[in-house]
């Protein structure tokens, strides 16, 4: 940590203003139709957005609506729960910077007010009672009561919540642990399994790569959100075993044939893998 706060100057302030304006608009307090819509001709369903580009109808609840997941796939419901937790966390951190570095209590208050609205929306809409796992976090909701139970490997994800915003969701939180058990099982429609060299492999995938591939990022996040060093090291060992001899982490791979992978070198996952190695062995 350098303690260098010189980056929080005019560019930072202007950028934050634009982000706040966008967040406010996408709370959709005046209805589903905002200035943003996205529609294009494509042979891939998740590359465009329904309802002439406006997406599934939403009911204003304080959360921020979005059209696409971190995977770049279009959402089914407009309120992506992991992204809203992350937004709340970042807004609270931005408020600290504004107050301590920029000496702007007014803008800090604005960030905190928006964070509070998101938090209220999450508390009222983010959880449902699963018949097998108890109370869990939904992946997406619409504010009307509809919800989607799944997780995608890309972060922000439900699995990654304690990694991205530990001040909001603890690893030991009961709802998170219930959710973790659900999404790291075949009760998550995007959890896939296979067997490679006698080892059964199961991990979370993504609609982005179809129905037969798991993502190293999900295995990494499993390790990064674990307090068990043995589990962390098991994740490292599995990732090393399934790199297809390339020495790199990939976007996704077939759990029964790691040589069948996408992206020969995926910087995002390679960086996270290094962090997991430090967490598992650096101590």
Task: Tell me what each language-model feature is.
Residues 20-88, 100-101, 108-215:
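Extended ligand-binding clefts on enzyme/binding-domain cores
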Residues 93-96:
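Intrinsically disordered, low-complexity activation-like regions
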Residues 2-17, 98-113, 165-180, 224-237, ...:
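Structural helix-adjacent loops and short alpha-helical linkers that scaffold large soluble proteins
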Residues 15, 187, 194, 218, ...:
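Enriched - but not universal
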Residues 1-48, 266-282:
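Aromatic-rich carbohydrate-recognition surfaces in CAZymes
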Residues 8, 76, 80, 262-266:
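Alpha-helix N-cap/helix-initiation motif
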Residues 148-170, 174, 210-283:
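C-terminal capping/lid segments that line or modulate ligand- or cofactor-binding pockets
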Residues 6, 31, 130, 231-232, ...:
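Secondary-structure boundary/capping signal
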């Amino acid at each position: 940590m350098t303690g260098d706060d010189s980056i929080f100057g005019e560019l930072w302030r202007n950028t934050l203003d634009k982000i706040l304006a966008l967040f406010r608009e996408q709370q959709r307090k005046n209805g589903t139709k905002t200035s943003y819509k996205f529609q294009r001709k494509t042979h891939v369903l998740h590359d465009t957005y329904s309802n002439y580009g406006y997406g599934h109808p939403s009911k204003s609840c304080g959360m921020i609506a979005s059209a696409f997941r971190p995977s770049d796939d279009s959402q089914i419901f407009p309120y992506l729960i992991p992204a809203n937790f992350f937004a709340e966390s970042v807004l609270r951190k931005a408020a600290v910077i504004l107050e301590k570095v920029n000496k702007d209590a007014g803008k800090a208050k604005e960030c905190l007010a928006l964070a509070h609205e998101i938090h209220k929306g999450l508390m009222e809409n983010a959880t449902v009672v699963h018949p097998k796992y108890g109370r869990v976090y939904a992946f997406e909701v619409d504010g009307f009561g509809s919800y989607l139970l799944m997780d995608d490997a890309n972060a922000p994800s439900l699995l990654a919540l304690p990694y991205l915003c530990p001040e909001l969701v603890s690893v030991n939180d009961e709802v998170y642990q219930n959710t973790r058990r659900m999404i790291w099982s075949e009760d998550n429609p995007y959890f896939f399994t296979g067997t490679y060299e006698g080892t059964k492999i199961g991990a979370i995938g993504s609609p982005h790569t179809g129905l037969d591939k798991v993502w190293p990022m999900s295995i990494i996040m499993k390790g990064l959100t674990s307090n068990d060093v043995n589990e962390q090291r098991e994740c490292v060992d599995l990732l090393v075993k399934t790199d297809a001899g390339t020495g790199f982490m990939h976007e996704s791979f077939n759990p029964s044939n790691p040589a069948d992978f996408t992206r020969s070198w995926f910087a995002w996952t390679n960086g996270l893998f290094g962090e997991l190695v430090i967490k598992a062995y650096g101590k």
